[in-house]
């Protein structure tokens, strides 16, 4: 691997879209042999890029505060974490099975080239992660790159990396990752490519299921900033004529930008913020592919300040912007929302509980349960070993890092009016003829987001049902459907066709249906389905492996019945169109015959009668169609009502379950307290009874001894002496009782002290066990390292023996040649001087070559000796540590 190296020479065909800025020093790459990870050593970033998340606000971590539902911010610990890393890239939305993919990024002096998969549970309260193996097509280590997800393809482009293209410039390859088969593919487009860069953004717009386009905008390379807009057709990436298209839009073009954000909504691109060559921007620009026009959006409300290195994502019809840093390198953790319909900004009220520390260079991912996931950035976010402590630590304690989630379910309450869908200044976001998706109030947020970005669909266009298509053409796929990628388009309803029919349609007999297959429809002939991928990998990661729920099976059955009705309706419509064509032909034939007989009025009357009959049949067909549609609508209403009732029941069950869990926890606490009190009472009661019994017995003895020992006083003096003795005895008894109580208290204190010492010893024992486990792991790692070192030493010794043998062979060859040369010198003394000189020159040259080979062998032998010595030293060091 070579170090980062980038020439300042830029092709002259880039035009006015390139503007100079300050250059950035280039990092150096190296290999980390310990974990087989490709790492790049860059120059140190600014101090603010390497800040530590210290005393930031956090959720309460005491065991008593278990009710975190009232917080919109929450923190989750990720044990095996790929973070911290800065200016990485991740998928902006989870997959159907709640997976997120993370690539690249920077931490301290290392640039990563690994790929991670983070999986979330259903409610987004816990996460697991695993590293994906690296293959030959995996992108090299990079930072500042851009990525997006399209169907089952995770797309990566650009970034600051050591890899150079054939012209010595930054890597300009496009990388496609199949999230099912975990394989990377590198397309090979022809013609001109966009320059490799970093700080740019890419987004997906699909005008129809057969054409998915990837848009690239902005970025920088050292002193050069970009505002060019380039598009690549992902649906044709395997075709030999696939290529990048350099657009030349009109309108109010944005300035050259880097470290901005770009999202796709309503088949348009929305660009916000970023750094220009002169300042930092907080403007919003919109690009309309249908018109190939840029426009600067005029917004209202509480607009964010100029920021860069922030993150954004689309939620319903809102563009969410989080974090970043301003012109003074002041970091932010504020959250802003732009209503893309009313073009009004809203700021999320600041709530300290659980909010992440100010950051930049992080990533933002939209989850299915109306939550945003914030990962990474310039802060370390190390987790604490205490399971209840959700504050960040300054050092890595082996417990992973913290992830942050933002709950958007109560967004309308926090920002009143934010979900308003009124259009701004008469602008319309309705569906165009080229396709697009306009969110509506009846569309669920999660599906809407997936439709707009993840797998865009064609609006109001019906795709043939299962029963209409021949076996083998059961699903649509774009050109991504092959051994590396498969992509299926969803099925939607189609508007009724008009009665105008092309005259080139072949006639069929009335009332017969047409079988729909690839042969009948050219659009199906261009589609291929990889049956192996469709049957295995595309369903490999779904939840169906655990069994299909009954309600889901019922829904699928209902949808299947609906599709069958639509297929029958399609056959009826086709037969009706054929019948219309035949009637039209009959009408024309009647007119033709009437014109021949010169009886125009009769022909006209017949024509009108035929038209009347045709219109009556058409009205009857429309009535039947209306009845079918009404029945379908009623079924859909019933289904919606059932689903709403089910959702209400589920929500009630969830609330009741939470209350039950809280009550059970409180009951457990009270039971434990009651048990402690009962145990204390049981310990104290016997002692108290014993003490009272002893006191009673002692007093009884005193009372019994008093009458027998008492004597009638003979005088007043004797009475005084007797009373004094009695008082002394009573006082002595009382003193003994006090001493007994003090001794008991002393014993109780000593018992508590011993219990505390016991708890301390247990804690020390637990710490020692943990340290022992860590030492065992270190010992295992050292043993593995020693084994690898021994293998390396053995290989080095074998190589050394090989070089020694070669050296001996060369020495023997030299001796043989010297002997032959001496013999031939004697023979050539008799020959002429010219021949003798040429022969000597030839042998001298051969001897010189052999000497050079001998010298190289000696050098290799010396280097192997040095390497062997270093390995022995390393082995000795490991043995000493062990």
Swiss-Prot record:
One GO BP: establishment or maintenance of bipolar cell polarity
Keywords of this entry: Coiled coil, Kelch repeat, Phosphoprotein, Repeat
Annotated segments matching region Disordered: 41-60, 480-516
Signal peptide range: none
The Kelch repeat ranges on this chain: 99-143, 153-207, 213-267, 268-317, 319-369, 371-417
TM ranges: none
Compositionally biased spans, kind Basic and acidic residues: 480-496
Modified residues (Phosphoserine): 509
Cellular-component GO terms for this entry: cell cortex of cell tip; cellular bud neck; cellular bud tip; Kelch-containing formin regulatory complex; mating projection tip
Domain of life: Eukaryota
Stretches assigned to coiled coil: 550-685, 728-881
Pfam families for this protein: Kelch_KLHDC2_KLHL20_DRC7
Modified residues (Phosphothreonine): 455
Bias-annotated ranges (Polar residues): 498-509
Additional detail: Present with 468 molecules/cell in log phase SD medium.
Complex and partners: Interacts with KEL1.
Protein name: Kelch repeat-containing protein 2
């Amino acid at each position: 691997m070579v170090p980062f190296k980038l020439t300042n020479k830029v092709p002259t065909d880039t035009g006015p879209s390139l503007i100079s800025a300050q250059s950035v020093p280039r990092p150096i790459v190296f290999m980390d042999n310990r974990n087989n990870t490709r790492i790049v050593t860059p120059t140190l970033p600014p101090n603010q890029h390497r800040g530590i998340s210290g005393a930031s606000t956090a959720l309460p971590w005491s065991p008593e505060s278990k009710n975190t539902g009232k917080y919109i911010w929450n923190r989750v610990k990720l044990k095996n974490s790929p973070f911290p890393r800065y200016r990485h890239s991740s998928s902006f939305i989870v997959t159907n099975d709640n997976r997120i993919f993370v690539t690249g990024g920077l931490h301290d002096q290392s640039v990563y080239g690994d790929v991670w998969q983070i999986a979330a549970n259903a409610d987004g309260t816990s996460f697991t992660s695993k590293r994906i193996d690296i293959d030959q097509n995996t992108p090299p280590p990079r930072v500042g790159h851009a990525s997006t997800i399209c169907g089952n393809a995770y797309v990566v482009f650009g970034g600051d990396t050591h890899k150079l293209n054939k012209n010595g410039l930054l890597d300009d390859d496009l990388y496609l990752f199949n999230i099912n088969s975990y394989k990377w593919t590198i397309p090979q487009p022809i013609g001109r490519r966009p320059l490799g860069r970093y700080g740019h953004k890419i987004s997906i717009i699909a005008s129809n299921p057969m054409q998915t386009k990837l848009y690239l905008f902005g970025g920088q390379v050292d002193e050069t900033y970009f505002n060019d807009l380039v598009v690549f057709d992902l649906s044709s990436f395997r075709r030999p004529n696939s290529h990048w298209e350099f657009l030349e839009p009109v309108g109010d073009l944005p300035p050259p930008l880097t470290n901005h954000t770009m999202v796709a909504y309503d088949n348009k691109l929305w660009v916000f913020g970023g750094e220009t060559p002169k300042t930092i921007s907080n403007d919003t620009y919109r690009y309309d592919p249908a018109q190939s026009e840029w426009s600067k959006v005029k917004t209202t409300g509480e607009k964010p300040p100029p920021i860069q290195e922030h993150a954004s994502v689309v939620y319903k019809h809102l563009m969410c912007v989080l974090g970043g840093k301003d012109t003074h390198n002041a970091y932010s953790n504020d959250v802003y929302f732009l209503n893309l319909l009313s073009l009004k900004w809203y700021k999320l009220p600041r709530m300290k509980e659980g909010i992440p520390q100010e950051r930049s260079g992080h990533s933002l991912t939209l989850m299915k349960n109306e939550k945003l996931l914030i990962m990474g950035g310039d802060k370390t976010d190390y987790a604490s070993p205490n399971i209840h402590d959700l504050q960040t630590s300054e050092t890595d304690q082996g417990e992973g890092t913290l992830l942050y989630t933002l709950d958007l379910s109560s967004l309308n309450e926090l920002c009143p009016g934010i979900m308003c869908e009124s259009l701004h200044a008469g602008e319309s976001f309705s569906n165009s003829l080229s396709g697009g998706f306009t969110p509506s109030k009846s569309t669920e947020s999660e599906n809407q987001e997936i439709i707009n970005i993840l797998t865009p669909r064609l609006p109001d266009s019906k795709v043939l049902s299962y029963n209409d298509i021949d076996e083998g053409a059961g699903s649509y796929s774009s050109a991504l459907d092959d051994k590396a990628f498969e992509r299926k388009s969803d099925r939607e309803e189609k508007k009724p066709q008009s009665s105008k029919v092309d005259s080139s349609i072949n006639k069929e007999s009335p009332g017969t249906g047409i079988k729909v297959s690839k042969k009948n429809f050219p659009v199906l002939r261009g589609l291929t389905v990889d049956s192996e991928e469709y049957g295995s990998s595309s369903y490999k990661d779904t939840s169906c492996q655990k069994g299909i729920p009954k309600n889901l099976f019922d829904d699928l059955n209902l949808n299947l019945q609906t599709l069958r009705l639509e297929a029958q309706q399609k056959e009826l419509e086709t037969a009706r169109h054929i019948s219309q064509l035949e009637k039209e032909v009959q009408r024309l034939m009647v007119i033709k015959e009437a014109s021949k007989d010169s009886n125009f009025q009769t022909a006209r009357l017949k024509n009108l009668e035929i038209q009347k009959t045709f219109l009556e049949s058409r009205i009857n067909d429309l009535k039947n169609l209306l009845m079918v549609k009404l029945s379908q609508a009623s079924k859909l209403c019933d289904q919606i009502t059932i689903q709403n009732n089910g959702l209400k029941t589920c929500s009630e069950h969830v609330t009741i379950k939470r209350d039950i869990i809280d009550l059970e926890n409180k009951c457990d606490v009270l039971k434990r307290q009651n048990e402690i009190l009962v145990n204390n009472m049981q310990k104290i009661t016997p002692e108290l009874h014993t003490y009272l019994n002893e006191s009673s017995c002692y007093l009884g003895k005193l009372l019994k001894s008093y009458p027998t020992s008492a004597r009638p006083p003979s005088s007043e003096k004797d009475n005084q002496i007797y009373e004094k003795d009695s008082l002394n005895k009573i006082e002595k008894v009382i003193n003994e009782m006090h001493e007994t109580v003090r001794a008991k208290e002393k014993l109780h204190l000593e018992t508590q002290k011993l219990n505390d010492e016991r708890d301390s010893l247990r804690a020390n024992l637990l710490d020692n066990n943990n340290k022992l486990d860590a030492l065992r792991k270190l010992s295992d790692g050292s043993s593995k390292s020693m084994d690898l070192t021994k293998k390396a030493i053995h290989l080095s010794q074998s190589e050394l023996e090989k070089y020694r043998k070669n050296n001996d062979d060369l020495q023997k060859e030299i001796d043989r040649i010297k002997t032959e040369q001496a013999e031939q010198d004697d023979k050539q003394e008799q020959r002429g001087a010219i021949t003798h000189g040429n022969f000597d020159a030839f042998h001298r040259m051969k001897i010189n070559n052999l000497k050079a080979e001998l010298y190289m062998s000696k050098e290799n032998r010396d280097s192997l000796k040095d390497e062997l010595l270093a390995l022995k030293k390393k082995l000795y060091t490991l043995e000493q540590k062990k």
